[in-house]
Design a protein with these regions (language model features):
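Carbohydrate-active catalytic/glycan-binding domains of CAZyme proteins
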Residues: 1-197
Length: 197
């Protein structure tokens, strides 16, 4: 069983049936499982042979993680590796206002990253992974945060916090359910790099 729980059955144009199921695997997310489906007395029966005879995809699949320099040509459409944490508010982000940059502006101030709009995300890859981001924080406003986070239900982040006209680099731990600033340092430059491993 291994915790395989949610999913469904699908049919191909050729009339073959498969089960596509998922198993929760902590920070990796949900791992997909493909099983063969046969029908017994009009009831689907899933079997898991060691191999399935499925032809290779000839269309091509976009990767689920990618590096991005945000140099897109019109019409601008984010790479499919990117996901929004909520439905995006399109008037508050742009890749054309400053070519080569993803620009996000604040529509409101939130107290929790899980509530913040226009949070751009990518899936983690495997049980360990790294993420690096370069930020231009020159135009931040009072109450703004910008940074890099790894989150599911519990989370933490490193970022820049703006209070009044003062910028600070902060490290926040929210694994207890509320944001706790565990480290802070003054910031006197407009470009910062963050990395999470």
């Amino acid at each position: 069983n291994n915790g395989v729980a949610q999913g469904g059955i699908i049919s191909t144009p050729e009339g073959k049936w498969y089960g596509l199921l998922f198993r929760d695997n902590g920070s990796v997310g949900r791992i997909p499982y493909l099983t063969q489906v046969t029908w017994t007395n009009n009831w689907p029966m899933m079997t898991a042979p060691a191999t399935l005879d499925i032809p290779a995809n000839t269309i091509g699949i976009s990767g689920i993680v990618t590096s991005d320099d945000f140099n897109y040509s019109a019409p601008v459409k984010l790479h499919t590796a990117w996901q929004w944490n909520h439905n995006p508010q399109n008037s508050y982000w742009s890749m054309t206002a400053r070519p080569g940059y993803f620009r996000s502006t604040t529509s409101r101030v939130d107290t929790d990253i899980k509530l913040a709009r226009n949070t751009l995300t990518q899936r983690t890859y495997g049980s360990t992974c790294s993420g690096v981001v370069s930020l231009d924080v020159a135009n931040m406003k009072d109450g703004d945060y910008a940074g890099l986070s790894m989150f599911q239900d519990k989370y933490g982040f490193v970022g820049v916090k703006m209070v009044g006209t003062t910028k600070s680099i902060v490290m926040v731990n929210a694994s207890s359910g509320s944001m706790v600033e565990v480290a802070s340092a003054p910031l006197n430059q407009n470009t910062v790099y963050f990395r999470i491993d």
